[in-house]
């Protein structure tokens, strides 16, 4: 606007040369008042994260298995804004990036470790234990004396459970740029001892005495909380099981 006004005044006072000088002064004034303009990059409008359904069972893991896990806590998405460009009449560009913190339950019994992790089918954490994107990871192995996670303590205070007896992981500030700024589908390679003795352990847990050879063919097993009879029937397809009922 100042460009037009000062250009017109300059033309009236000093002719064409005055108009050029006035227009130049006007452009400088416009930049001071209006600025160089700004471009906004894509930005999310919904920052809440959905967690797993209440009451969803957490399986017991044996041996080496790959599981999706269940999200038991999540923060809202954290938004970061960065501005680049500008100067010499060029507009500034604002870009947005997002991260999330979340806890994912893996097993209802203790585990030894978590090896590889995939996000949307791509390797997120390799055998060396390094995340392929920004953020950090903590593994809680599910022992009876495990302390609460420090991030959950900071967020939930006195309401924070330790999830003793439940193995879970906590991602802190997991960067989401590589996943379309959304929480990706996760899967975890979990090592939980040996699966060869799973039949005996499940039988004893449900009040049975099981006498059988180890299930040598079994590298891993996911016990989803079904009945002992159903579970042992599945395992009996791999090796003969001798099972006796032990009354209470």
How would you label these PLM feature ranges?
Residues 1-19, 205-206:
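Short hydrophobic membrane-inserting alpha-helices and related fusion/pore-forming segments
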């Amino acid at each position: 606007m100042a460009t037009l006004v000062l250009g017109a005044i300059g033309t009236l006072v000093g002719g064409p040369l005055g108009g050029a000088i006035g227009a130049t002064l006007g452009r400088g004034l416009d930049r001071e008042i209006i600025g160089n303009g700004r471009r906004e990059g894509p930005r999310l409008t919904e920052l809440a994260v959905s967690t797993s359904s209440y009451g969803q069972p957490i399986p017991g893991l044996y041996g080496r298995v790959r599981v999706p896990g269940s999200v038991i806590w999540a923060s809202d998405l954290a938004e970061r804004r960065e501005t680049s460009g500008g100067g010499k009449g060029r507009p500034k560009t604002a870009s947005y990036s997002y991260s999330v913190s979340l806890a994912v339950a893996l097993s209802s019994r203790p585990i030894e470790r978590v090896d590889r992790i995939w996000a949307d089918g791509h390797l997120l954490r390799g055998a060396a234990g390094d995340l392929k994107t920004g953020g950090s990871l903590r593994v809680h192995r599910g022992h009876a004396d495990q302390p609460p996670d420090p991030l959950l303590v900071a967020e939930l205070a006195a309401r924070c459970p330790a999830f003793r007896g439940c193995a879970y992981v906590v991602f802190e500030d997991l960067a989401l740029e590589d996943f379309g700024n959304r929480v990706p589908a996760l899967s975890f390679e979990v090592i939980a001892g040996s699966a060869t003795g799973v039949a005996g352990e499940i039988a004893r847990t449900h009040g049975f005495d099981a006498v059988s050879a180890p299930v040598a063919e079994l590298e891993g097993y996911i016990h989803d909380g079904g009945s002992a009879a159903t579970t042992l029937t599945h395992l009996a397809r791999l090796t003969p099981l001798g099972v006796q009922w032990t009354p209470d």
